[in-house]
């Protein structure tokens, strides 16, 4: 959150686990950020192949108490119209209710169900592990 504009294309070249929320970050946002961190850490040696990204969809100030927990996350402000052109929620859901997986080419290829709980997070972890195994030969760690 350096204040400098950043193009979404700079995120290419790495698997991404994205969440979208306003800067005020309500309880659902905090839960998604927690799950993103846990899912990434749960990948063990493959965690460096997956970036944890929070896309902030408004100009609200981020809660000071949340900043220390975001040390390994990439946090970017992105206009809502840009997000709507790139990501798509399930029918009847909001963009902010899902976690999204984006491939190294910059295409979102998977979203996890809205309101992910611990049981759902276990299934999501298995999906991410399969994805990392399947892409191991053509993906490189780090950007």
Summary of predicted features, one role per range:
Residues 26-70:
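Structural microenvironment flanking redox-active thiols in thiol-disulfide oxidoreductases
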Residues 12-14, 47-49, 94:
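Extracytoplasmic
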Residues 8-36:
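Short active-site neighborhood of thiol/selenol oxidoreductases, capturing the structured segment around
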Residues 1-9:
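N-terminal "domain-start" segment that seeds a small globular fold
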Residues 95-143:
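Thiol-/selenol-based redox modules, centered on thioredoxin-like
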Residues 19, 40-47, 87, 128, ...:
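Sec/Tat-exported extracytoplasmic proteins
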Residues 12, 21, 56-58, 79, ...:
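A mature extracytoplasmic/lumenal domain signature
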Residues 51-102:
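Short, internal strand/loop/helix patches
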């Amino acid at each position: 959150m350096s204040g400098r504009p950043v193009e979404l294309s700079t995120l290419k070249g790495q698997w991404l686990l994205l969440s979208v929320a306003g800067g005020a970050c309500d309880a659902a946002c905090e839960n998604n950020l927690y799950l993103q961190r846990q899912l990434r850490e749960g990948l063990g040696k493959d965690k460096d192949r997956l970036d944890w990204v929070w896309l902030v969809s408004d100009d609200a100030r981020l809660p000071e108490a949340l900043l220390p927990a975001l040390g390994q996350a990439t946090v970017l402000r992105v206009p809502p119209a840009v997000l709507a052109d790139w990501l798509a929620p399930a029918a009847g859901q909001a963009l902010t209710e899902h976690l999204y997986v984006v491939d190294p080419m910059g295409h979102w290829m998977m979203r996890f169900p809205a309101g992910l709980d611990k049981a759902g997070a276990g299934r999501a972890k298995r999906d991410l592990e399969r994805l990392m195994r399947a892409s191991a030969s053509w993906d490189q760690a780090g950007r």
